Amino acid sequence: MIRVSIIGATGYTGIELVRLLANHPEVELSSLVSRNASNKPLSDIYPQFIGRIDLKFSEYDCQAICQNSDIVFTALPHGISQEIVGELYNCGVKIIDLSGDFRYKDSAIYEKWYRENHHYPHLLEKAVYGLVEINRNSIKRSSLVANPGCYPTASLLGLWPVISENLINLNTIIIDAKSGVSGAGKGLKRGSHFVEVDENIKGYSIGSHRHTSEIEEIIKTFSGNQKAIVSFTPHLVPMKRGILATIYVKLKQSISERALRELYHKYYPDHGFIKVLPRDIFPETKYVVGTNYCYIGLKYDTRTERLVIISAIDNLVKGAAGQAIQNMNVMFNLPEYMGLKQVGVFP
Protein backbone atom coordinates (compact mmCIF):
# COMPACT_ATOMS: atom_id res chain seq x y z
CA MET A 1 0.00 0.00 0.00
CA ILE A 2 1.10 3.55 -0.73
CA ARG A 3 1.17 5.65 2.43
CA VAL A 4 -0.28 9.09 1.63
CA SER A 5 -0.29 12.36 3.53
CA ILE A 6 -2.29 15.42 2.53
CA ILE A 7 -1.22 18.86 3.71
CA GLY A 8 -4.04 21.38 3.49
CA ALA A 9 -6.68 18.69 3.78
CA THR A 10 -9.64 20.89 4.78
CA GLY A 11 -9.71 23.04 1.63
CA TYR A 12 -11.84 22.16 -1.38
CA THR A 13 -8.94 20.55 -3.21
CA GLY A 14 -7.64 18.80 -0.11
CA ILE A 15 -10.96 17.25 0.82
CA GLU A 16 -11.50 16.21 -2.81
CA LEU A 17 -8.21 14.32 -2.54
CA VAL A 18 -9.55 12.59 0.58
CA ARG A 19 -12.82 11.68 -1.18
CA LEU A 20 -11.08 10.17 -4.20
CA LEU A 21 -8.29 8.43 -2.30
CA ALA A 22 -10.83 6.81 0.04
CA ASN A 23 -11.76 4.60 -2.94
CA HIS A 24 -8.22 3.93 -4.17
CA PRO A 25 -7.35 0.24 -3.64
CA GLU A 26 -3.60 0.84 -3.29
CA VAL A 27 -3.67 3.80 -0.89
CA GLU A 28 -3.52 4.06 2.88
CA LEU A 29 -4.20 7.55 4.20
CA SER A 30 -1.46 8.20 6.71
CA SER A 31 -2.05 11.77 7.86
CA LEU A 32 -4.30 14.74 7.14
CA VAL A 33 -2.67 18.04 7.99
CA SER A 34 -4.65 21.17 8.75
CA ARG A 35 -3.52 24.04 10.93
CA ASN A 36 -7.08 25.23 11.56
CA ALA A 37 -8.57 21.82 12.40
CA SER A 38 -5.72 20.18 14.30
CA ASN A 39 -6.79 17.26 16.53
CA LYS A 40 -10.37 17.32 15.23
CA PRO A 41 -11.76 14.14 13.63
CA LEU A 42 -12.23 14.33 9.88
CA SER A 43 -15.87 13.28 10.25
CA ASP A 44 -16.60 16.16 12.65
CA ILE A 45 -15.93 18.66 9.88
CA TYR A 46 -16.97 16.51 6.93
CA PRO A 47 -19.70 14.10 8.14
CA GLN A 48 -19.77 12.27 4.80
CA PHE A 49 -16.75 10.34 6.07
CA ILE A 50 -18.46 8.96 9.20
CA GLY A 51 -17.67 5.25 9.35
CA ARG A 52 -15.36 5.53 6.34
CA ILE A 53 -12.15 7.18 7.53
CA ASP A 54 -11.15 7.24 11.19
CA LEU A 55 -8.48 9.95 11.13
CA LYS A 56 -7.92 13.21 12.96
CA PHE A 57 -6.38 16.29 11.44
CA SER A 58 -2.91 17.04 12.72
CA GLU A 59 -0.38 19.86 12.80
CA TYR A 60 2.40 19.90 10.23
CA ASP A 61 5.39 17.86 11.43
CA CYS A 62 7.95 17.40 8.68
CA GLN A 63 9.83 14.56 10.35
CA ALA A 64 6.69 12.57 11.18
CA ILE A 65 5.29 13.00 7.68
CA CYS A 66 8.53 11.88 6.06
CA GLN A 67 8.68 8.78 8.26
CA ASN A 68 5.06 7.78 7.67
CA SER A 69 4.54 8.70 3.99
CA ASP A 70 5.57 7.42 0.59
CA ILE A 71 4.05 10.47 -1.09
CA VAL A 72 2.73 13.83 0.09
CA PHE A 73 0.11 15.99 -1.60
CA THR A 74 0.49 19.67 -0.76
CA ALA A 75 -2.84 21.45 -1.29
CA LEU A 76 -1.79 24.86 -0.02
CA PRO A 77 -1.84 28.44 -1.29
CA HIS A 78 1.11 29.57 -3.39
CA GLY A 79 3.96 31.01 -1.37
CA ILE A 80 3.12 28.87 1.66
CA SER A 81 3.45 25.65 -0.32
CA GLN A 82 7.02 26.27 -1.50
CA GLU A 83 8.28 26.42 2.09
CA ILE A 84 6.70 23.07 2.96
CA VAL A 85 7.84 21.44 -0.29
CA GLY A 86 11.38 22.71 0.26
CA GLU A 87 11.50 20.93 3.62
CA LEU A 88 9.87 17.71 2.45
CA TYR A 89 12.04 17.37 -0.64
CA ASN A 90 15.18 17.13 1.50
CA CYS A 91 13.89 14.03 3.29
CA GLY A 92 13.38 12.07 0.08
CA VAL A 93 9.60 11.66 0.06
CA LYS A 94 7.72 11.97 -3.25
CA ILE A 95 5.68 15.16 -3.57
CA ILE A 96 2.81 16.38 -5.71
CA ASP A 97 2.31 20.11 -5.24
CA LEU A 98 -1.08 21.53 -6.22
CA SER A 99 -0.09 25.20 -5.90
CA GLY A 100 1.50 27.30 -8.62
CA ASP A 101 4.88 27.38 -6.88
CA PHE A 102 6.73 24.83 -9.03
CA ARG A 103 5.05 25.07 -12.44
CA TYR A 104 7.68 27.37 -13.95
CA LYS A 105 11.33 26.78 -14.79
CA ASP A 106 12.18 30.48 -14.47
CA SER A 107 11.67 31.97 -11.01
CA ALA A 108 11.54 35.48 -12.50
CA ILE A 109 8.36 34.63 -14.42
CA TYR A 110 6.80 33.16 -11.29
CA GLU A 111 7.73 36.23 -9.26
CA LYS A 112 6.35 38.60 -11.91
CA TRP A 113 2.94 36.96 -12.13
CA TYR A 114 2.52 35.79 -8.53
CA ARG A 115 4.16 38.80 -6.88
CA GLU A 116 5.87 36.42 -4.50
CA ASN A 117 9.57 35.70 -4.00
CA HIS A 118 10.62 32.15 -4.82
CA HIS A 119 12.93 30.79 -2.13
CA TYR A 120 13.64 27.43 -3.79
CA PRO A 121 14.62 28.21 -7.41
CA HIS A 122 16.94 25.19 -7.46
CA LEU A 123 13.86 22.94 -7.18
CA LEU A 124 12.22 24.45 -10.27
CA GLU A 125 14.59 22.50 -12.51
CA LYS A 126 13.81 19.28 -10.64
CA ALA A 127 10.03 19.73 -10.70
CA VAL A 128 8.11 18.08 -13.55
CA TYR A 129 4.92 19.57 -14.96
CA GLY A 130 2.18 17.08 -14.17
CA LEU A 131 -0.04 17.07 -17.24
CA VAL A 132 0.12 13.33 -17.82
CA GLU A 133 -1.18 13.36 -21.39
CA ILE A 134 1.81 15.39 -22.58
CA ASN A 135 4.50 14.57 -20.03
CA ARG A 136 3.93 10.98 -18.92
CA ASN A 137 7.50 9.67 -19.20
CA SER A 138 9.05 12.51 -17.21
CA ILE A 139 6.42 12.12 -14.49
CA LYS A 140 7.31 8.43 -14.12
CA ARG A 141 10.88 9.35 -13.18
CA SER A 142 10.09 12.34 -10.99
CA SER A 143 9.93 12.74 -7.24
CA LEU A 144 8.48 16.29 -7.41
CA VAL A 145 5.48 16.92 -9.64
CA ALA A 146 3.89 20.33 -10.13
CA ASN A 147 0.19 19.70 -10.63
CA PRO A 148 -1.17 22.00 -13.36
CA GLY A 149 -3.68 24.76 -12.78
CA CYS A 150 -7.33 24.15 -13.61
CA TYR A 151 -7.64 26.61 -16.49
CA PRO A 152 -4.32 25.52 -18.05
CA THR A 153 -5.45 21.89 -17.88
CA ALA A 154 -8.63 22.55 -19.85
CA SER A 155 -6.83 24.88 -22.27
CA LEU A 156 -3.67 22.87 -22.93
CA LEU A 157 -5.52 19.59 -23.43
CA GLY A 158 -7.74 21.31 -25.96
CA LEU A 159 -4.77 22.81 -27.80
CA TRP A 160 -2.20 20.08 -27.56
CA PRO A 161 -2.68 18.09 -30.79
CA VAL A 162 -2.67 21.15 -33.06
CA ILE A 163 0.31 22.65 -31.23
CA SER A 164 2.28 19.41 -31.44
CA GLU A 165 1.67 19.18 -35.18
CA ASN A 166 2.59 22.86 -35.66
CA LEU A 167 -0.79 23.56 -37.27
CA ILE A 168 -1.66 26.88 -35.62
CA ASN A 169 -0.23 30.36 -35.30
CA LEU A 170 0.81 30.58 -31.66
CA ASN A 171 0.14 34.32 -31.49
CA THR A 172 -3.55 33.89 -32.37
CA ILE A 173 -4.72 31.88 -29.35
CA ILE A 174 -7.83 33.25 -27.64
CA ILE A 175 -9.25 31.43 -24.62
CA ASP A 176 -12.61 32.33 -23.09
CA ALA A 177 -13.15 30.21 -19.98
CA LYS A 178 -15.96 29.88 -17.42
CA SER A 179 -15.45 28.39 -13.96
CA GLY A 180 -17.61 27.37 -11.04
CA VAL A 181 -17.20 29.15 -7.72
CA SER A 182 -15.18 26.38 -6.04
CA GLY A 183 -12.29 27.47 -8.25
CA ALA A 184 -11.97 30.56 -6.05
CA GLY A 185 -11.15 28.39 -3.04
CA LYS A 186 -12.72 28.02 0.38
CA GLY A 187 -11.58 31.32 1.88
CA LEU A 188 -14.25 33.90 2.66
CA LYS A 189 -14.41 36.70 0.13
CA ARG A 190 -17.18 38.98 -1.04
CA GLY A 191 -17.04 37.76 -4.63
CA SER A 192 -17.87 34.21 -3.51
CA HIS A 193 -20.95 35.06 -1.42
CA PHE A 194 -24.18 33.48 -2.66
CA VAL A 195 -25.95 36.80 -3.23
CA GLU A 196 -22.98 38.08 -5.25
CA VAL A 197 -22.64 34.97 -7.41
CA ASP A 198 -26.22 33.80 -7.93
CA GLU A 199 -27.82 34.86 -11.24
CA ASN A 200 -24.60 36.62 -12.21
CA ILE A 201 -21.69 36.04 -14.59
CA LYS A 202 -18.59 38.18 -14.50
CA GLY A 203 -15.14 38.31 -15.99
CA TYR A 204 -12.20 38.79 -13.68
CA SER A 205 -8.42 39.33 -13.80
CA ILE A 206 -8.84 40.53 -17.38
CA GLY A 207 -5.46 40.44 -19.11
CA SER A 208 -3.67 39.62 -15.88
CA HIS A 209 -4.72 36.15 -14.70
CA ARG A 210 -1.73 34.08 -13.54
CA HIS A 211 -2.76 31.09 -15.60
CA THR A 212 -2.07 33.09 -18.76
CA SER A 213 1.65 32.85 -18.10
CA GLU A 214 1.40 29.16 -17.20
CA ILE A 215 -0.30 28.35 -20.50
CA GLU A 216 2.26 30.37 -22.45
CA GLU A 217 5.23 28.85 -20.65
CA ILE A 218 4.06 25.26 -21.09
CA ILE A 219 3.40 25.82 -24.79
CA LYS A 220 6.91 27.23 -25.10
CA THR A 221 8.49 24.37 -23.15
CA PHE A 222 6.82 21.60 -25.15
CA SER A 223 6.83 23.18 -28.63
CA GLY A 224 10.55 23.56 -29.24
CA ASN A 225 10.87 26.93 -27.48
CA GLN A 226 8.32 28.67 -29.71
CA LYS A 227 6.83 31.75 -28.12
CA ALA A 228 3.06 31.83 -27.67
CA ILE A 229 0.91 34.88 -27.05
CA VAL A 230 -2.34 33.94 -25.37
CA SER A 231 -5.35 36.17 -24.79
CA PHE A 232 -7.03 34.54 -21.80
CA THR A 233 -10.21 35.77 -20.13
CA PRO A 234 -11.73 33.83 -17.21
CA HIS A 235 -15.31 34.23 -15.99
CA LEU A 236 -17.03 33.22 -12.77
CA VAL A 237 -20.40 31.53 -13.27
CA PRO A 238 -23.05 30.55 -10.69
CA MET A 239 -22.32 26.83 -10.34
CA LYS A 240 -20.26 24.85 -7.84
CA ARG A 241 -17.94 22.88 -10.13
CA GLY A 242 -16.74 22.82 -13.68
CA ILE A 243 -14.75 24.67 -16.32
CA LEU A 244 -15.81 25.23 -19.90
CA ALA A 245 -13.05 26.67 -22.08
CA THR A 246 -13.78 27.94 -25.58
CA ILE A 247 -10.55 28.30 -27.56
CA TYR A 248 -10.13 30.11 -30.88
CA VAL A 249 -7.06 29.61 -33.09
CA LYS A 250 -5.97 30.35 -36.66
CA LEU A 251 -4.67 27.43 -38.69
CA LYS A 252 -1.47 27.83 -40.72
CA GLN A 253 -2.94 25.89 -43.62
CA SER A 254 -6.28 24.58 -44.77
CA ILE A 255 -7.24 21.27 -43.18
CA SER A 256 -10.59 19.53 -43.01
CA GLU A 257 -12.52 19.16 -39.79
CA ARG A 258 -12.54 15.41 -40.35
CA ALA A 259 -8.73 15.35 -40.51
CA LEU A 260 -8.55 17.45 -37.35
CA ARG A 261 -10.86 15.06 -35.53
CA GLU A 262 -8.72 12.11 -36.63
CA LEU A 263 -5.66 13.94 -35.33
CA TYR A 264 -7.28 14.43 -31.92
CA HIS A 265 -8.26 10.77 -31.76
CA LYS A 266 -4.64 9.83 -32.51
CA TYR A 267 -3.37 11.95 -29.63
CA TYR A 268 -6.19 10.96 -27.29
CA PRO A 269 -7.10 7.27 -27.79
CA ASP A 270 -10.49 6.19 -26.51
CA HIS A 271 -9.05 4.36 -23.49
CA GLY A 272 -7.76 7.59 -21.90
CA PHE A 273 -9.30 10.34 -19.80
CA ILE A 274 -9.70 12.66 -22.79
CA LYS A 275 -12.86 12.13 -24.81
CA VAL A 276 -13.10 13.67 -28.30
CA LEU A 277 -16.76 14.09 -29.14
CA PRO A 278 -18.38 13.30 -32.51
CA ARG A 279 -19.06 16.01 -35.06
CA ASP A 280 -21.51 18.74 -33.95
CA ILE A 281 -21.60 17.47 -30.37
CA PHE A 282 -19.94 19.77 -27.87
CA PRO A 283 -18.94 19.41 -24.21
CA GLU A 284 -21.06 20.47 -21.29
CA THR A 285 -19.84 20.72 -17.72
CA LYS A 286 -22.56 18.27 -16.63
CA TYR A 287 -20.73 15.52 -18.52
CA VAL A 288 -17.67 15.71 -16.27
CA VAL A 289 -18.85 16.70 -12.78
CA GLY A 290 -17.12 14.50 -10.21
CA THR A 291 -14.85 12.86 -12.81
CA ASN A 292 -11.28 13.00 -14.05
CA TYR A 293 -12.37 13.27 -17.67
CA CYS A 294 -11.86 16.08 -20.14
CA TYR A 295 -14.38 16.30 -22.99
CA ILE A 296 -13.32 18.05 -26.19
CA GLY A 297 -15.40 19.26 -29.14
CA LEU A 298 -14.14 20.74 -32.42
CA LYS A 299 -15.57 23.01 -35.09
CA TYR A 300 -13.74 24.57 -38.02
CA ASP A 301 -15.50 27.84 -38.83
CA THR A 302 -14.91 28.24 -42.56
CA ARG A 303 -16.31 31.78 -42.60
CA THR A 304 -13.75 33.14 -40.11
CA GLU A 305 -11.13 30.49 -40.87
CA ARG A 306 -10.82 29.77 -37.17
CA LEU A 307 -10.74 26.44 -35.40
CA VAL A 308 -12.99 26.51 -32.34
CA ILE A 309 -12.08 24.04 -29.58
CA ILE A 310 -14.31 23.55 -26.56
CA SER A 311 -13.12 21.60 -23.54
CA ALA A 312 -14.86 20.78 -20.27
CA ILE A 313 -13.42 19.52 -16.99
CA ASP A 314 -14.33 19.39 -13.32
CA ASN A 315 -12.01 22.00 -11.83
CA LEU A 316 -11.65 20.05 -8.56
CA VAL A 317 -10.96 16.68 -10.21
CA LYS A 318 -9.16 16.78 -13.57
CA GLY A 319 -8.30 20.39 -12.73
CA ALA A 320 -6.79 19.50 -9.35
CA ALA A 321 -7.23 16.42 -7.10
CA GLY A 322 -8.01 13.79 -9.75
CA GLN A 323 -5.12 14.88 -11.91
CA ALA A 324 -2.85 14.73 -8.86
CA ILE A 325 -3.93 11.13 -8.22
CA GLN A 326 -3.40 10.31 -11.90
CA ASN A 327 0.14 11.65 -11.46
CA MET A 328 0.62 9.52 -8.35
CA ASN A 329 -0.49 6.43 -10.26
CA VAL A 330 2.08 7.14 -12.96
CA MET A 331 4.84 7.78 -10.40
CA PHE A 332 4.16 4.41 -8.75
CA ASN A 333 3.66 2.47 -12.01
CA LEU A 334 -0.02 1.85 -11.31
CA PRO A 335 -2.77 1.93 -13.94
CA GLU A 336 -3.69 5.56 -14.54
CA TYR A 337 -7.39 4.79 -14.06
CA MET A 338 -6.93 3.34 -10.58
CA GLY A 339 -9.26 5.13 -8.16
CA LEU A 340 -10.49 7.44 -10.93
CA LYS A 341 -13.21 5.53 -12.80
CA GLN A 342 -16.10 7.69 -11.65
CA VAL A 343 -18.87 8.47 -14.13
CA GLY A 344 -20.25 12.01 -14.22
CA VAL A 345 -23.04 12.91 -11.78
CA PHE A 346 -26.27 13.73 -13.58
CA PRO A 347 -28.47 15.71 -13.31
Curated annotation (Swiss-Prot):
Q: Which reaction is the catalytic activity of this chain?
A: N-acetyl-L-glutamate 5-semialdehyde + phosphate + NADP(+) = N-acetyl-L-glutamyl 5-phosphate + NADPH + H(+)
Q: What class of enzyme is it?
A: oxidoreductase
Enumerate the UniProt keywords alphabetically.
Amino-acid biosynthesis, Arginine biosynthesis, Cytoplasm, NADP, Oxidoreductase
- Record's subcellular location: Cytoplasm
Could you give a GO molecular-function term held by this entry?
A: NAD binding
The biological process GO terms on file are: L-arginine biosynthetic process
The record's EC number reads: 1.2.1.38
> What metabolic or biological pathway is this protein involved in?
Amino-acid biosynthesis; L-arginine biosynthesis; N(2)-acetyl-L-ornithine from L-glutamate: step 3/4
List of catalytic residues: C150
Q: Name one GO cellular component term.
A: cytoplasm
Specify one Pfam family: Semialdhyde_dh
Q: Which CDD domains does the entry link to?
A: AGPR_1_C, AGPR_1_N
* Protein family membership: Belongs to the NAGSA dehydrogenase family. Type 1 subfamily.
Query: NCBIfam families given for it?
Result: argC (TIGR01850)
Give a short account of what the protein does.
Answer: Catalyzes the NADPH-dependent reduction of N-acetyl-5-glutamyl phosphate to yield N-acetyl-L-glutamate 5-semialdehyde.
Question: What name appears for this protein in its UniProt entry?
Answer: N-acetyl-gamma-glutamyl-phosphate reductase
The organism of origin for this protein: Halothermothrix orenii (strain H 168 / OCM 544 / DSM 9562)
UniProt gene name: argC
